[in-house]
């Protein structure tokens, strides 16, 4: 699987990327500080250009970013996010209903809330740790 990973200052990217690679997936990273998690035309264009240049099976992020969800929806690429913060204000956006989304949250109450709101692709998934590194 070819994965495009948006990296920001989250603490758990190293372990997640390492696990993807150990499972045989290829991972490309994109990093950019975002001033707005909902709309950033320049960053959206950059992601689209990467997707047009190379096939990606999914885009992965730690925490949820509406602008990435909307870009994936437009490009027909799966968007997988795994939350590590709660409350995660960025999830309270209409884009959580996009069909491209596969949202995993470590907070069961958060999962139940969004499931009840009608978000189709949301699951409860506790946070993980690299037990070999500890």
Where in this protein do the model-derived segments appear?
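Extended catalytic core of nucleotide-activated donor transferases of GT-like folds
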Residues: 9-19, 23, 28-115, 133
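Carbohydrate-associated surface elements
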Residues: 128
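Extreme N-terminal starter segment of soluble prokaryotic enzymes
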Residues: 1-3
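A short alpha->loop->secondary-structure connector
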Residues: 119-124
């Amino acid at each position: 699987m070819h994965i495009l990973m948006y990296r920001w200052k989250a603490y758990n990217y190293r372990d997640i990327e390492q696990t993807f690679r150990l499972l045989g997936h290829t991972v490309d990273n994109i990093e950019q500080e975002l001033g707005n998690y909902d709309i950033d035309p320049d960053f959206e264009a950059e992601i689209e250009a990467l997707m047009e240049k190379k096939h990606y099976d999914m885009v992965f992020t730690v925490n949820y970013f509406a602008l990435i969800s909307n870009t994936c929806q437009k490009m027909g690429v799966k968007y997988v996010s795994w939350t590590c913060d709660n409350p995660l204000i960025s999830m309270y956006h209409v884009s959580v209903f996009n069909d491209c989304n596969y949202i995993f949250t470590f907070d069961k109450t958060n999962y139940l809330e969004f499931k009840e709101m009608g978000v189709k692709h949301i699951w409860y998934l506790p946070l993980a740790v690299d037990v070999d590194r500890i």
